[in-house]
């Protein structure tokens, strides 16, 4: 893609999206000239080209692609420039690999977060991933179906989805004859959400939360999952919430299990 779009001479970049970048679904093309220009741009084709690799092997670029994929029906020049930035990033980090060790333990651990009001649209973004042997094996970014009125509700929704995915992962590991003795750990940086998942003591203040989301409360009570606090700066799922500065992005990318591997001929 770098060669196809004549980006080989572009200056290498260290992050897939510039820090502080925000887009709005309300943005639209108002003049005929940019409309005609964007009609000739293969925006949807490029999104499709990078979407599948991001799902299976490029977690570091997942947030940028997720944001830009929301504008496939009506992309603007700014979206196209941001997408080219992603392509340049992937070319700049072609030696960055998701690595695994044969000595890694088959013990899963989850991390979750929510982008509540981070971009200029109403629906929060659920972000979570699972580690195994300190390497990312499964990750997801998805727009929530309902508008969360508080960050607590947004993150509580995420916990429910990560709990369901975690139980499936535990079942899969059992088929591999790797049955964990301890509950599956899910890390969260919201103390209120953790308290709600454990004892639901804020019932009168959270009754607007649909009962289906209290699934997490049940699996915690059953001892299948343990929700624990992790400082925001150490929560690796933060790499999915918004465009980060270079230093923090690279720190979290390393926690994903991404390392530079130089091949010698």
Task: List PLM regions with ranges.
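Long, low-complexity, charge-biased intrinsically disordered regions
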Residues: 1-265
């Amino acid at each position: 893609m770098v060669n196809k779009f004549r980006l080989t001479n572009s200056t290498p970049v260290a992050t897939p999206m510039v820090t502080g970048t925000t887009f709005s679904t309300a943005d639209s093309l108002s003049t005929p000239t940019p409309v005609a220009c964007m009609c000739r741009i293969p925006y949807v084709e490029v999104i499709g080209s990078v979407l599948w690799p991001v799902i299976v092997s490029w977690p570091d670029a997942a947030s940028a692609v997720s944001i830009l994929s929301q504008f496939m029906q009506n992309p603007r020049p700014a979206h196209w420039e941001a997408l080219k930035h992603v392509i340049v990033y992937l070319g700049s980090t072609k030696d960055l690999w998701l690595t695994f060790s044969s000595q890694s333990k088959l013990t899963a651990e989850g991390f979750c977060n929510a982008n509540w009001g981070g971009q200029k649209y109403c629906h929060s973004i659920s972000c979570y991933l699972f580690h195994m042997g300190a390497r990312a094996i499964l990750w997801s970014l998805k727009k929530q179906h309902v508008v969360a009125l508080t960050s607590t509700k947004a993150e509580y929704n995420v916990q429910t989805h990560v709990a369901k995915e975690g139980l499936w992962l535990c079942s899969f590991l059992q088929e591999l004859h790797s049955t964990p003795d301890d509950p599956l750990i899910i890390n969260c940086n919201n103390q209120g959400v953790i308290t709600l998942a454990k004892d639901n003591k804020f019932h009168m203040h959270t009754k607007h939360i649909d009962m289906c989301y209290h699934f997490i409360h049940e699996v915690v009570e059953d001892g299948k999952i343990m929700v624990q606090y992790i400082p925001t700066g150490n929560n690796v799922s933060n790499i999915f919430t918004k465009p980060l500065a270079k230093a923090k992005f690279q720190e979290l990318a390393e926690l994903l299990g991404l390392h530079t591997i130089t091949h010698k001929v």
